[in-house]
Amino acid sequence: MAANQPVVVLPENVKRFMGRDAQRMNILAGRIIGETVRSTLGPKGMDKMLVDDLGDIVVTNDGVTILKEMSVEHPAAKMLIEVAKTQEKEVGDGTTTAVVIAGELLRKAEELLDQNVHPTIVIKGYQLAVQKAQEVLKEIAMDVKADDKEILHKIAMTSITGKGAEKAKEKLGEMIVEAVTAVVDESGKVDKDLIKIEKKEGASVDETELINGVLIDKERVSPQMPKKIENAKIALLNCPIEVKETETDAEIRITDPTKLMEFIEQEEKMLKDMVDTIKASGANVLFCQKGIDDLAQHYLAKEGILAVRRVKKSDMEKLSKATGANVVTNIKDLKAEDLGEAGIVEERKIAGDAMIFVEECKHPKAVTMLIRGTTEHVIEEVARAVDDAIGVVACTIEDGKIVAGGGAAEIELAMKLRDYAEGVSGREQLAVRAFADALEVVPRTLAENAGLDAIEMLVKLRAKHAEGNNAYYGLNVFTGDVENMTENGVVEPLRVKTQAIQSATEATEMLLRIDDVIAAEKLSGGSGGDMGDMGGMGGMGGMM
């Protein structure tokens, strides 16, 4: 073999980016994701219109929804989107904040890399900074009691503000607090799945209502059944009210017409016995997860029982929690003690569709919010805002800690981190300072999105916090002044902030550790590992 003969390890159809090129490319991809959602941050943030291949439209300023709906191919960009998804899953809000901070951390890291600071030193500095940031956040956090509905209402309204439900935020905030406090368990934990969100267009957002029970998007199986039952005794069945067919292919040959009548009568008797069992238990309302035979429907209507069939499993679980009923899998086992109770069970027409309302439950551990809106797009955006607000109220009840909003927490963190950086030796000090500067992207962006002078606002905020004991002063985007955010009712759960900063830092560190990107091009005529045109990141590259 000749000494100068090249050794080919990777095939020709593979793109490879190494060292500084790989880092620069990944940083750029992450920054673009941050910039994409940055204009949506805060109560004065703008909305994005997302259109798919079929022409379906989503209009939203919810960070995680924007990123989920975007067609992103770049692997580094996908990692940033995971930050938003994690934030949504863990706390329900703060997704845009997390991604914007991550984008700014990457920008600051790139500046340090350009100054020949090694990536591992940047990572070490960021780790020191995030650790200190978590300590400072705990110090400036305020305690809140789980039954302090006034504070919880303010937290809900802070989350809703600027998300398409502005006019009805007072009412929605009250409903959300009522809903979340209703489903808190003995240990103080909140299962958000027990709050059902039902959407119906055809009315204004003001007509949104909270039902202390469950709303089922079904109608009664027979018009002969009563439409409304008061003092309802509710049976929940996870078995069909039908004659069970045999699994074998056996045939029954009938030669005598009387035998046929006996056969039919026997089937009728079986169905009648099932209905009699339901009646004997004392039930006057039946929710069945499976089917109900036509003849059984007739017998149930005759007995004055309101029945609903093919109810979703998730709805059955909520009905059980709301009414106290047990889900019975064999109709023969149905007893009076398995029944649940509700003040009213009624079929009503909402936007032309029949729906079953199970209301006035004594101690409902499952509730429903019926979201109304003039169009589908309005309803979807309000539902997203409500879902986020439910998440932050739940966090507050579980943790009992809140911080000031309006960029107050970030400015205080930045100030404390700069002081902390003085005691950090080596080049890590530069990374801690860069981290502090990066956190100020939140108040800066709030000011920009409100049409204010970002530099002027930052100077005012820094000056106010430097006076001491002013950790709660942030930017009021409606007046353009630096004000006490706690007095204005602009507060957020501590967990939203800690999770956003932690997730953003971890994603940044992961991207900075990458110094080699190997991607196979899409093979013609077959499926390949296409990761987009990763070299062309000057614009949006292969990301969208």
Curated annotation (Swiss-Prot):
CDD domains registered for this protein in UniProt: cpn60 (cd03343)
Gene3D superfamilies from the UniProt entry: GroEL, GroEL-like equatorial domain, TCP-1-like chaperonin intermediate domain
Similarity comment: Belongs to the TCP-1 chaperonin family.
Entry-linked Pfam families: Cpn60_TCP1
Name of the gene this protein is made from: ths
Protein name: Thermosome subunit
Gene Ontology MF terms: ATP binding; ATP hydrolysis activity; ATP-dependent protein folding chaperone; unfolded protein binding
InterPro entries named in the record: Chaperone_TCP-1, Chaperonin_TCP-1_CS, Cpn60/GroEL/TCP-1, GroEL-like_apical_dom_sf, GROEL-like_equatorial_sf, TCP-1-like_intermed_sf, TCP-1_chaperonin, thermosome_alpha
Assembly: Forms an oligomeric complex of eight-membered rings.
Superkingdom, natural source: Archaea
Physiological role: Molecular chaperone; binds unfolded polypeptides in vitro, and has a weak ATPase activity.
Entry keywords, A to Z: ATP-binding, Chaperone, Nucleotide-binding
